[in-house]
């Protein structure tokens, strides 16, 4: 078992709507609000009185639908859409969602955000039994399980399939007569339900998509829940009662847009609280606070308010460069860092700078930014990270492939500080992170998955277990 199976992983965004005459166009607008979750490909599938039509391609949403006819042909009152992040070698149209399947006398579409931890085993077993896969994505597995279930009822087949797949998943399934949303038993990925003024129902990876189409948030989908949208409205069902909230803490730290709310917590507010707590844990002297745009700006505000230091715009971002964390190869990441940021000499020259960032993954970005600030005249650069040290992989749907790619898994804080060229390095504590996010729940770790920081995974790792345990004894130098 190698980490190659991790190439099935994707951090994506899904959006669906039921009961609106312009369903596909509204899905386009909803996906536009989710573009930050993936820029490798996009697609929309619409249902027009039982006829399902789809358009998908690689690239940004605006590129995929550059020809307006591609959107106009997607008529109907319900639709689902997907924006995709792909790991290296996967950026082909075959892997772009939504997928479209035929089953008995019907069709259905499927869009998925997450990663299945038993995908390799399931796929091998399905292929032995004659299943033919048209993509390399783990998302296709659910459809084959539904097809091959012997449960007499169709909803029973879906529930059986959902209980068979393991890991992190937020699924949208569009049928001729219904739209179904399903969330994994730990709620690793966010998924929210909204309603429009005309009664149309919407479901989205993030609530920021509701604002752009004028929808009002109803509630989040619960772990282990199956939500059915049809001519009768909304039906809330469950496929399992063995649930425990463990939503991905990286949604609050990095992935989600600041104007989204997840589990009742506004992302911007959570990040500000992370920054304030980081200031309380910071032990060095400085003159100004500089946040790394854009996902660290909220934390920088909180740090500045708590510390009493001025929050300055010492770094300027080129808004037309993709985010480095979710670009698919190391070469592209390094090029991206060079292109996307500039230091403001007039702000940082002669100053002791606290550089606030949301995370350190490989160290490429931090090293380059510290160098930029010092070249611009900063006399000291103290790096303060508004999350704990990322020392363990994610197996539930984030592009953290292995421990060998994580600088904190291979070096002490002091060594990492030396490698990135900073004068000091401070990480937010795990308890500080949990308290700052502050989900109202009795679940362990405040309802968060913090396995990336402490290595304590809330579920079995299945196909990844053997290789992961081997990796704990391996070291990679970042010097």
Per-range role (PLM):
Residues 162, 177-178, 214-220, 314, ...:
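PRPP-dependent phosphoribosyltransferase catalytic core
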Residues 308-353, 364, 391-397, 401:
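Short, glycine/charge-rich flexible loops or terminal/linker lids adjacent to PRPP-binding catalytic cores
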Residues 131, 151-152, 283-287, 305-312, ...:
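Secondary-structure transition/capping motifs at alpha-helix termini
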Residues 160, 208-209, 216-217, 224-225, ...:
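Phosphate/diphosphate-binding loops
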Residues 111, 174, 182-183, 194, ...:
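Generic beta-strand/beta-sheet core signal
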Residues 22-24, 87-88, 118, 188-189, ...:
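Flexible loop/turn segments at secondary-structure boundaries
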Residues 20, 128, 148-151, 309, ...:
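Short, well-ordered loop/turn and helix-capping segments at boundaries between secondary-structure elements
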């Amino acid at each position: 078992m190698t980490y190659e199976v991790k190439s099935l992983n994707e951090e994506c965004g899904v959006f669906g709507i039921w009961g609106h005459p312009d369903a596909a166009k509204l899905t386009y607008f909803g996906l536009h609000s989710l573009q930050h979750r993936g820029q490798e490909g996009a697609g929309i599938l619409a249902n027009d009185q039982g006829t399902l039509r789809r358009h998908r391609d690689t690239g940004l949403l605006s590129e995929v639908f550059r020809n307006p006819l591609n959107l106009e042909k997607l008529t109907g009152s319900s639709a689902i859409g997907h924006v995709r992040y792909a790991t290296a070698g996967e950026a082909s149209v075959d892997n772009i969602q939504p997928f479209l399947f035929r089953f008995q006398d019907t069709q259905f579409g499927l869009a998925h955000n997450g990663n299945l931890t038993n995908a390799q085993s399931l796929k091998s077993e399905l292929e032995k039994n004659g299943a033919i896969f048209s993509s390399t994505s783990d998302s296709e597995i659910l459809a084959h399980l539904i097809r091959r279930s012997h449960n007499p009822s169709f909803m029973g087949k879906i529930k059986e399939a959902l209980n068979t797949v393991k890991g992190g998943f937020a699924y949208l399934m569009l049928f001729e007569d219904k739209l179904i949303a399903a969330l994994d038993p730990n709620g690793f990925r966010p998924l929210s339900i909204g309603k429009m003024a005309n009664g149309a129902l919407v479901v989205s990876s993030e609530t920021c998509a509701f604002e752009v189409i004028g929808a009002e948030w109803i509630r989040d989908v619960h772990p282990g829940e199956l939500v059915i949208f049809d001519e009768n409205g909304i039906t809330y069902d469950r496929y399992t009662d063995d649930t425990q909230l463990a939503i991905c803490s990286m949604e609050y730290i990095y992935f989600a847009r600041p104007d989204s709310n997840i589990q009742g917590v506004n992302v911007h507010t959570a990040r500000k609280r992370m920054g304030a707590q980081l200031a309380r844990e910071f032990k060095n002297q400085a003159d100004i606070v500089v946040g790394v745009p854009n996902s660290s700006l909220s934390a920088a505000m909180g740090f500045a308010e708590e510390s009493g230091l001025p929050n300055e715009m010492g770094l300027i971002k080129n808004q037309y460069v993709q985010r480095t964390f979710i670009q698919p190869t190391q070469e592209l990441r390094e090029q991206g860092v060079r292109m996307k940021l500039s230091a403001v000499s007039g702000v940082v020259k002669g100053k002791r700078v606290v550089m606030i960032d949301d995370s350190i993954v490989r160290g490429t970005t931090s090293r380059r930014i510290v160098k930029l600030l010092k070249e611009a005249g900063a006399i000291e650069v103290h790096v303060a990270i508004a999350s704990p040290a990322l020392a363990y992989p994610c197996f539930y749907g984030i592009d953290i492939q292995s421990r060998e790619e994580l600088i904190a898994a291979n070096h002490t804080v002091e060594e990492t500080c030396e490698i990135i060229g900073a004068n000091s390095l401070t990480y937010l504590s795990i308890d500080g992170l949990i308290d700052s996010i502050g989900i109202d729940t009795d679940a362990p770790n405040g309802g968060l998955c913090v396995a990336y920081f402490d290595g304590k995974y809330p579920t079995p790792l299945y196909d990844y277990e053997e290789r992961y345990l081997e990796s704990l004894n391996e070291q990679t130098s970042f010097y």
